[in-house]
């Protein structure tokens, strides 16, 4: 065999060695946990044959605690580029079979390389996390490695989409990188995220809690809002990541892919003419409205299990990807609170950063009252949603279905926040407050006098409520002053949104020159 062929054989052997990660036994352990390896995940996510791997032969440089004898090619992370549905993406996947996926200086360098390239190429970045944390043997170098990654997360924010998949443990400082990305997906039962683990919590606070209840997927999907999606299986999780990518652009200079539309834009949905209940305090399901107006009724929801009183997610109108923000009357009457405001604000800001038009479906009676809300800074969080809508320069269309009261009316894409098109259904009630509250305030003195005179106060207040409703509980007062562009028939909503988006396709808007705003935090 010639020297050249011998070298090629050596290359092939090294590649095979690198592909084994921590070895066959470690791979089997990973499979026994019900988890795929880093390479298997990358192969599932990317188009077949498209993966271009970087730094396959890179090794760590640590000589402490006998680490020089524990070398594995690639050092615990698979990194490179590939395509998903033909679109370029950059990806890294931590390999739990190598030193439990712990982050070393070398791993950080590999991750930072694909992050830098993603920025240069204007392509989405996907990180699959499955790591025991920092590699303790490397000391401060491991911490510096995390910091290098975080800095790039920050610089890439608003420039390229960043998506994190939590497919195993993610603890300590490692949690900050997913927190800095745009979307996070967690695997149910096999992944968790927390700053301090159960043992530390027990030692410091005396609280006895397991990993799942401290930082499992269910906790972060329903209570903290840290994760945007959860999946029961890794196959399902991979498919969700692919679906998400189909709705968003590759970078902040582009728009999302337009899909062929087979659903007529002028399709009338007669059911919408009767979806609003006669009783103004009766709930209805906003999901039915969304399904009735979007292309083929499809909707990809973001954070479906968190703050259910507001709905956010992606849909298409005439093939164009759009962000939807909608109050949900079937949950807490659709009121805004701390979590709903936070959820809505983050989504609106993502849409604005990546050129996704925003369609708002409004039925909101106000902000949730109470000390629990005030003590948890509902003022600041409500201001975040207000700020997000106000700074957004993408096309914005608001449709008011029923209630739109007080400060919540302003916050939910009002005309004064430079919303381009504001429509209202005939059932819309745009006012400072509802009739019962308004009558109680406006006629307090008269009601008191009638009570002292022994007259029927309830009948008096009911009469005044009817008068208030006649005057304000309709869209025409707002339309009279130009705060509503048109009152539309509910069944015609899809067509009006599609036509409005086409009209706004060439919109150009700008903000005053500044380094950056100071959003209420």
Predicted regions and their residues:
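Ligand-binding clefts of soluble mixed alpha/beta catalytic domains
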Residues: 1-521
